[in-house]
Structures are given as C-alpha cells and as structure tokens.
A protein has these predicted regions:
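Structured interaction and signal-relay segments at domain junctions
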Residues: 190-194
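Short, solvent-exposed alpha-helical surface patches in non-cytosolic proteins
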Residues: 88-90, 185, 227-228
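Carboxylate/His-rich catalytic cores and anion/metal-binding grooves
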Residues: 113-127, 170-189
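A conserved glycine-rich beta-strand in the N-terminal activation segment of trypsin-fold
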Residues: 5-8, 173-175
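Active-site loop and adjoining helix of the penicillin-binding protein/serine DD-peptidase-beta-lactamase fold
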Residues: 142-182, 197-230
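Small/polar-residue-rich segments within soluble enzyme cores
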Residues: 16-23, 28, 32, 36-148
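Structured segments of extracytoplasmic/periplasmic soluble domains
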Residues: 94-98, 112, 161-170, 189
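Short, glycine-anchored, charge-dense loop/turn motifs used at functional sites
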Residues: 2, 9-19, 163, 179-188
Length: 230
C-alpha cells in the first residue's frame, strides 16, 4: 500500500506549492535478486529496512531515489509532499509519520486534505515462497476515494521565494511578512531559522527553535515603542 495522497496547496495564480516532485517506489520480490539490485539506490534511511526484509516471503514496496525500470524493477510513481527546496515551510507546516498534519495549514486543514487523495496498492499473485506466479505481473490498483480538493492560498510564490532568499542571507532569527495594501491578503510569510519538513528530527536535534513560526509569535515591544507614544 502506498501512502494515501493528500490534497495540495497552490499559490494565488495556481502554482503548486506541494505534490510536484516525483517519488519512486520499487517492488522488492523475494528470490529475484531484488535486494542486490535495489540496495545502491535506496536512501540511507531506508537501507536498514531493506536489509531486515531481504528474506521476506512476501513482496513489498520500498522508496528509491531513481526510476529503475531499465533495471527490470517494477516501479510505481508517486509525488513527494514537499518541493526539493520547500516553500513557506512554517505556514504550510509538516506531517507526522502517519501522514497527518502536525503544524500550520497541514494541521488546520488535515481532515479536508486527507480526504482529497486516492489510495493506491500493488497487487501481486505469488507462490507459497513469495515468488511471482509464472505468467503474472504486478498490477497497480487505485481506489477512487478522494474528493480532489485543493487549497489556494493568497501567497505569491515568486514573492515568497524572494523573501526567503533575503531572510536566509540577512537574518539568523526573525520573520518577513508581505501584505497587500487594501485587501490585507498575505503575499509572503517567512520565518527564520527554517526547518526541513522531510526531516523534523534534525530540527529537534539542532535545538535552534526553527519549528517556531515567528510570523505568528508575540514579541515584547520594549522601550523602542516609547518613541511611537512620545
């Protein structure tokens, strides 16, 4: 079973902010040398899982870094949740290990986004030893359970990227917010330091408070505000 797809986020003119980059899953079949073929292409974090299941008697899917169809491996294409360089990380948030929103808009709209995608599974007909039955091929089964719901934000992806670049070059901690005059719509919102939504554990270990969205945090005005009141 593949992870259930979620509804995506788009910027104000329809540019996707999530669900763009392809992700590949390879089918590992007992007894067909899948282990040796797949190991060099499996991300480091997944190598232990592949090694532990090398003698499995049932086929299973594992994420790999490239399309290995040319190597004779049965592949299933999916989409990574976040871009290679994630955008609006604090605003969008991140998912837990079960694919549910933990922070940001991912959490606020979790029920809606979770119900938006279809479920996929790979069906195999195998022998008692786990080998594919002669004359059969794996089949991808898609269960159309999704509502195809997506969420369009007021963000402008170009302005957001520009703000993130400026923040990365000029501040270790802080935030930048761009608001449209008149409508009050938020065109960009970035917070520093940033985190990797695909590796939350690294941010926790770093202990740099990168998970705090400073755009939404309260700051004490302090003595500098006395100038306004004077």
């Amino acid at each position: 079973m593949l992870p259930i797809r979620r509804g995506n986020f788009y910027d104000r003119i329809g540019r996707p902010l999530t669900g763009v980059t392809p992700r590949w899953y390879a089918l590992c079949i007992p007894g067909d040398s899948s282990y040796a073929t797949l190991f060099p292409f499996v991300p480091f974090a997944q190598q232990a899982q592949l090694y532990a299941r090398r003698n499995s008697i049932t086929p299973f899917l594992i994420e790999v870094e490239d399309d290995l169809s040319a190597n004779g491996v049965f592949m299933v294409a999916d989409a990574r949740r976040y871009l290679p360089t994630p955008i609006a990380r604090h605003l969008i948030g991140y998912l837990d290990g079960d694919g549910h929103g933990m922070t940001g808009l991912e959490k606020a709209y979790d029920d809606l986004l979770a119900a938006a995608g279809d479920a996929q599974a790979v069906l195999c007909t195998t022998t008692a030893r786990g080998d594919l039955l002669a004359g059969t091929t794996p089949q991808v089964q898609t269960t159309a359970r999704g509502t195809n719901t997506a969420i369009t934000l007021t963000l402008d992806a170009n302005i957001q990227r520009a703000c993130e670049a400026i923040a990365a070059q000029n501040m270790s901690k802080g935030c930048i917010i761009v608001m449209q005059v008149g409508s009050g719509q938020i065109l960009a919102s970035t917070s520093m330091p940033e985190f990797d939504p695909d590796d939350i554990a690294a941010s926790i270990r770093a202990d740099d408070t990168s998970l705090i969205n400073r755009s939404l945090s309260a700051f004490s005005a302090g003595s500098v505000f006395k100038v306004v009141l004077a």
